[in-house]
Amino acid sequence: MKKWNRICLLMIGAVLSLTACQKKADGADGSDGSGLGEGGVNASEAVAAQPEKEWTYVPEFLTVADDRASYGDMQLVGDTVCYISMVGEAQGEPQKMCRYSLTRRELTQVSFQWPLEEENLEICSFAFNPDHSVWLIVNAYSADYSQLNRYLCRFDPEGNNMSFQDITQEMGRDSSVGDMAVDGQGRIYVFTSEYAEGEAAGIWLYTGEGRYQAKVPFGTSETVRVIGTVDRSEESLCVCVSKGENPEHCAMLEVDFEGKRLIEVDAEFPNINGLCEIRQSPADSADGAFGSQNSFGGGDSAESNRAPDKEATGEYNLLLYDDKYVYGYDFPAEGKKSRQSPEELFAWTDSDINGYFVEDFSILEDGRYYVTVEDWTNEDRCIALLRRTRTEDVVPCKNLVLAAVDGDSALAALAVRFNRSQERYRIDVQDYGSLTDLYNAILTGEAMDLIDLSGVDVESLMRQGVFEDLRPFLEQSESLAPDDFVEGILDTYTIDGTLVGIPDSFTLRTVAGDRTLLGDDAGLTLERLLEIAQSNPEALPIGEVTKNEMMQYLMMFNQDAFIDWETGECRFDSPQFQAVMEFVNRFPDSLENLPGEDSLPRKIHDGRVLFAIAEIRRPGNIQRYEGMFGETAACVGFPTADGSGGTLLYAGNAFGITATSQYKEGAWKFIESVLDPKEAEQMEPEELVYSIRWELNGLPSVKKIMDRMNEYYLEDDREWAAKGRDFGFLTYEDGWIIEFHALTQEEIDTVLELVKDAKPFYSAEEDDVVKIIGEEAPAYYRGQKSLEDVAEIIQNRVQLYVNEHR
């Protein structure tokens, strides 16, 4: 059972919303109309020639008026959503049996009439029957929690106890209990959770009357996660399981209830998050075909699982789903080995659903798809009902393609939130496997209106004219203005006068050290770093960095010292680059912490390491490096030609609009929705800081939000210090201790100064010049070739590359 893992929002009423947008090409006049969005060739028109999907899955969203509703544990029984309420924070808030009617949109809550003597009760698993009665596995603790007994209980729909029995002996006190299921005959299956170890993992079997039958092991030492269940026939249940940490396949196991064993039906079942069975009428069922609806505890009855028309579901036995798509799948008939690959039906985002947080998927009597979503971080907890509708009958939207590398759940959440908020535009996230794939897609003119700038070399793409200038949009925005942002944020993403992107949050990476090493220099230059390294031959110049990483950092900040893109001249055979290679050769090939090895602070204290990489996600992070370098600590920056701009800014949720997009106005609306500070401005200070720390996981770009955060930290630390309390410490394995203190305004100012002089991070390992260096330099590092020979090879290869790409 999932735990109550976040402070609930205020109780909200049932909320209905219906969207009817489909990602399809608009008519020839499908531009934004007047304003900034006009002109250009729409990248999305590239998909107009592709076959339009015949079906659209139009969503309707419901929210149950219960702040203790657990969408992750809801079970569909007919047209009723059944669940056990989550444990409340207040004393005396017992869990209740809850039923929400999808037809009447009514919530019924029933208290349990417990027959147990123990007062401290914990429901750790449950399964509802077709008649809305429920089986529970209950942990019952003594008053001091020193004793534990386990019970299998059944309650009728009104909360009256029908039966209970002590199952402590067969289930044990230390076993890890997961989900439950009830098959078509009412028999009970209790699964161990994914935390069960080795041979302890398995299934406890109980008859429909609750009598213990056996425990059947999964028979593997690997971690086992139960994905879902389906009835293979009236006589047996099949369980889909995932074995190991990163499995390529799932396995389908048939439970032989009477034989007390598991039979492997399919060892290479698709690797999925969940599955849903399409119930067929007896006349349609073939030998070995599945015959009942899947849901943990959903059971089987003609009333609750009447088959939808095949026209609505397609010719499939099962529907499967993962983070991004829903698939149709034909399970092979009994005794047959051949199977078809899953067929993609639709993407979750097509229906404004973040598939990373789908908890359950099933089919209603009328053929609609039932989906539950529980995303605490983005406050998206709901039931979605999807109606299969012909695309031609759906009002079209203007579809915008957002190109991203390995777009994650957070990006999907932004797209879903935007798509639900309005009817004119839709964001479709297009994933690319690597930055190289993305760059190639841009080069070949693939459809895209927005680009996720995470790790992207914006300077290089700007030279190719890829981006639209965002400043005119920002200046005309009704909700944002240039002065709203922390000083330096807009400058960081302004390339040759063009504002490429605006992050909603950021983190910083720079080099920290003893500022006295710099002499009179304001910042660390490449020349000065090489001199310092030469003067300290026994010391590692920068701690905890590999050769490849060091070369990438140096090229990120100093590539222009060796390439003149205007003239095409390259200088990789120069004495300066040879000195760089000698410098990089002092770093390790890999980072391995050996037993008993001294910590980085101790090495710095002893002079064995001169500088350290500094990561800054909050203003107080500066104190760690003050603890390493003492009173003369400073953020000196990565080495650059003139000692300025030596800080990397890692952007959160920064998006650029492509110059070829016809829907620039719609693309800007999406960016506005990401940056809009209204919600954060309405939060109480403590809630705001919590949100920044755990959701942004970085520093906010909006100045008002940054100021409120810093004010809270300063005041909170002042109050803490006034009470005479300490601020904690960081202890290393060798005993070195860094003590923390109350945050100071000077430390905040240090962080803000770094922002003013930062440059956007990009993934240098995807840079073609860095790749060439990485391929050739190891021959020098390993002593296979001379420094001069390797430098000449790099010079020739890079020169050829520059000549081809100028």
Segments predicted by a language model, with ranges:
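Conserved N-terminal structural module of periplasmic/extracytoplasmic solute-binding proteins
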Residues: C21-Q91, Q95-R104, N120, F126, ...
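Short, solvent-exposed loop/beta-turn-alpha elements that line the ligand-binding surface or hinge
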Residues: R471-D484, D560-M581, G637-L648, K756, ...
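C-terminal capping/gating helix-and-loop segments adjacent to ligand/active sites or protein-protein/ligand interfaces
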Residues: L649, D716-V798
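Short helices/loops that flank or line small-molecule/ion binding pockets
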Residues: T436-I451, E459, E531-S535, D589, ...
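Extracytoplasmic "Venus flytrap"/periplasmic binding protein-like
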Residues: R424-F485, T494, L517, K603-I604, ...
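Helix-loop-helix "hinge/cap" segment bordering the ligand-binding cleft or interdomain interface
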Residues: S101, D156, Q213, T494-G596, ...
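Hinge/lid segment of periplasmic solute-binding proteins
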Residues: V458-T510, L524-R528, T632-P639
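Extracytoplasmic/periplasmic substrate-binding proteins
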Residues: Y100, D589-E672, P677-Q682, E687-L696
